[in-house]
C-alpha cells in the first residue's frame, strides 16, 4: 500500500490527464448546442464580420447581457480557424487547461504537491468541467481565470512579488470581462475572509491593493467605454434585453455592475426570475461534482470543523471562496446550475486535502469506499443502458472500452489497496461513462438538432439567400454557408424564384405554403439537447417528442 505522501506518481498523473483529455478533445468537435452557446457563437461570428469590438450587437440589434471577453476570444478564433465548433470551443478549453494548472499550483501552495496533484485531477475529471467544455458558455473561461487569479494573489501575499500582484489583478479584470462582478467577488471574499479570521490586518491595508484595483480597471476600461457610449449616452434608445423585456432607459454601466449580478440576489432585477428553492444548488452540486461529490461534502465539513476548533493552523482562503458565494447564490431569485462552478476549483482543493488527510482505517474511509463501489457499478450500468436502451449500438468501438474497463477495475480492486484504490477505480469507472457520453450519447443527442440538419442540407444547393423568422434557430445561422437574413414570412414576395430558401418551424410552415408557391420542402426532426427527458431518451417514445423544422425553396 502506498503511503499518503506518494498517492499519485508523476507517471500516473500524466496517464490520467491524457485519458480524460480525449473527452475534451472530442468535445471540441461536437455540435454547438444550447440556447446560450448558439447565441454566443452567432454573436461572435457577427462581431468578427463587423469588426465592432466595443459595442455589442446581435443580428443588428443592441445586446446587453454578458460582458465581451468570451465574444472577443471566439471572434478571434473564428478569424483564425473559420466559423466552426472547434474554433468556438478552443479558447474555453485553453482556459480549462489554465484552470487545471492553477488548481495544482494553488493546492501545492496551500498544502503540498500531492494535494495539488489530487485536486487538479479531481477538477479535470469532474462532470461539471467536462460538461462546460461541451456546452460552452462564459463560465468555462471564468472558472479558469478566477482560480488563476487566486493562485497569483495568494502567492503575492506570501512572497510580496509585484509580478504576482499584477497577474492576479489582470486575472480579476479578465474575469469581470467575461462574467461581471462575480469575477471580483470570489477573490475578494477568499482573501478577505482569510485576513479577517486570521487577524492579518497588515494584509488588509496594503497600499499595493490600490495599484491592483487600478490594473483591473484598466483591463475592463474598453468594455466600460463601450457600455457608456452604446447605452448611457443614449438613454432613449429602444431595444430589448436578453429576456425580451424592453430595455429603454437602461444604463449599461448600472446593468453591468448591479442588475446583472447583485440585482438578482437582492430581487431588484425583475428581468430574470425562476423561483428556484434555497436547496437548488444542493442537488446541482451532487450531480455536477461527480464522481467526487461525497469527497467534496466530507472535505468541506471537515475543513469547517477543524477550522473552528483551531483556526490558527488552517487557511481560510478556500472556505472564503466557497461558503459566502454559495449562500448568496442560493438566495438569488434566478438560479442556473453553472453559477456555482466559479468556486469549484477551491472546493476540489478541499476534496484533495481531505483525501490526503484521510486515514485508511477510519470509519469514514470505509463508508467512502463502499459509496464509490456503488458509484462505479452505477457508472457501468448507465453506460450499458445508453448503449442498449437509449441509443442502441453494436459497435465494437463503443463496447470494447466498457469490457476493457471492467477488467481493469477488477485488476485495480485486486492489486491496489487503500486510498489509491479508491481514486484509481473511481477514475476508471467515470472514464467509462464519460467515454460513452462523449463519443456516443452526446453526438447522438445533438444529431436531433433540426436547425443544424437544415444548415447541412442547404450546402447541397446553389443557395442565393437564406431567410428565417425563427430567432431560436441560431445553429442554422452558425453552420450555414450563406448569411441568414431575418424577415417575416410575408415580407419575401420580392425574393421568390431566385434560389432563395426560408427556414421555419412547424407553427410557421402553413403560412409559408399558403403564401408562396414552393419548389421544394425539406423536413427535419428536432429535439433540444439541453432538454433530455426520459420520453426522448427511450427509443420507443422518442418520435412523440420531436418537433419539426422546414427548409423551403420559394
What does each of the following model-derived ranges do?
Residues 1-365, 444, 528, 532-534, ...:
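Membrane-integral, polyisoprenol-dependent glycosyltransferases
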Amino acid at each position: 500500500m502506498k503511503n499518503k505522501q506518494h498517492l499519485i506518481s508523476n507517471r500516473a498523473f500524466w496517464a490520467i490527464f491524457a485519458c480524460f483529455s480525449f473527452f475534451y478533445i472530442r468535445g471540441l468537435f461536437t455540435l454547438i448546442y444550447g440556447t446560450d452557446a448558439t447565441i454566443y457563437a452567432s454573436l461572435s461570428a457577427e462581431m468578427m464580420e463587423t469588426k465592432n469590438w466595443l459595442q455589442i450587437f446581435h443580428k443588428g440589434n443592441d445586446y446587453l447581457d454578458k460582458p465581451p471577453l468570451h465574444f472577443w476570444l471566439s471572434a478571434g478564433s473564428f478569424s483564425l480557424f473559420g466559423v466552426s465548433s472547434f474554433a468556438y470551443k478552443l479558447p474555453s478549453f485553453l482556459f480549462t487547461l489554465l484552470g487545471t494548472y492553477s488548481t495544482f499550483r494553488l493546492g501545492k501552495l496551500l498544502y503540498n504537491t500531492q494535494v495539488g496533484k489530487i485536486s487538479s485531477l479531481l477538477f479535470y475529471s469532474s462532470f461539471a468541467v467536462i460538461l462546460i467544455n461541451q456546452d460552452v458558455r462564459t463560465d468555462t473561461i471564468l472558472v479558469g481565470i478566477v482560480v488563476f487569479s487566486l493562485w497569483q494573489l495568494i502567492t503575492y501575499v506570501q512572497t510580496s512579488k509585484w509580478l504576482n500582484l499584477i497577474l492576479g489583478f489582470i486575472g480579476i479584470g479578465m474575469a469581470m470581462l467575461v462574467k461581471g462582478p462575480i469575477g471580483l467577488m470570489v477573490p475578494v471574499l477568499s482573501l478577505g475572509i482569510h485576513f479577517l479570521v486570521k487577524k492579518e490586518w497588515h494584509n488588509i491595508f496594503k497600499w499595493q491593493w490600490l495599484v491592483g484595483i487600478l490594473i483591473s480597471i484598466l483591463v475592463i476600461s474598453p468594455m466600460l467605454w463601450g457600455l457608456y457610449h452604446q447605452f448611457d449616452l443614449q438613454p432613449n434608445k429602444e431595444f430589448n434585453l436578453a429576456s425580451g423585456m424592453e430595455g429603454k432607459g437602461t444604463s449599461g454601466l448600472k446593468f453591468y455592475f448591479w442588475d446583472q449580478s447583485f440585482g438578482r440576489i437582492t430581487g431588484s432585477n425583475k428581468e430574470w426570475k425562476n423561483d428556484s428553492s434555497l436547496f437548488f444548488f444542493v442537488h446541482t452540486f451532487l450531480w455536477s461534482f461527480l464522481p467526487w461529490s461525497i469527497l467534496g461534502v466530507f472535505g468541506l465539513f471537515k475543513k469547517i470543523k477543524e477550522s473552528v476548533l483551531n483556526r490558527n493552523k488552517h487557511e481560510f482562503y478556500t472556505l472564503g471562496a466557497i461558503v459566502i458565494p454559495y449562500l448568496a447564490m442560493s438566495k438569488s431569485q434566478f438560479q442556473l446550475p453553472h453559477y456555482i462552478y466559479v468556486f469549484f476549483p477551491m472546493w476540489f482543493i478541499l476534496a484533495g486535502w481531505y483525501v490526503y488527510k484521510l486515514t485508511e482505517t477510519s470509519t469514514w474511509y470505509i463508508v467512502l469506499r463502499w459509496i464509490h463501489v456503488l458509484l462505479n457499478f452505477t457508472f457501468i450500468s448507465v453506460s450499458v443502458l445508453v448503449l442498449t436502451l437509449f441509443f442502441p449500438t453494436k459497435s465494437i468501438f463503443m463496447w470494447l472500452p466498457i469490457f476493457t474497463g471492467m477488467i481493469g477495475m477488477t485488476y485495480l480492486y485486486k492489486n491496489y489497496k487503500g486510498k489509491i484504490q479508491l481514486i484509481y477505480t473511481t477514475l476508471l469507472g467515470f472514464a467509462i461513462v464519460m467515454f460513452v457520453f462523449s463519443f456516443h450519447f452526446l453526438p447522438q443527442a445533438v444529431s436531433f438538432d433540426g436547425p443544424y440538419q437544415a444548415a447541412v442540407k442547404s450546402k447541397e444547393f446553389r443557395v442565393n439567400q437564406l431567410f428565417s423568422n425563427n430567432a431560436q434557430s441560431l445553429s442554422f445561422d452558425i453552420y450555414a454557408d450563406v448569411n441568414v437574413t431575418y424577415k417575416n414570412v410575408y415580407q419575401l414576395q420580392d425574393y421568390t424564384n431566385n434560389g432563395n430558401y426560408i427556414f421555419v418551424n412547424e407553427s410557421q410552415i402553413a403560412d409559408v405554403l399558403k403564401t408562396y408557391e414552393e419548389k421544394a420542402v425539406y423536413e427535419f426532426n428536432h429535439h433540444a439537447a439541453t432538454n433530455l427527458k426520459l420520453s426522448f431518451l427511450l427509443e420507443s417514445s422518442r418520435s412523440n417528442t420531436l418537433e419539426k423544422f422546414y427548409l423551403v425553396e420559394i
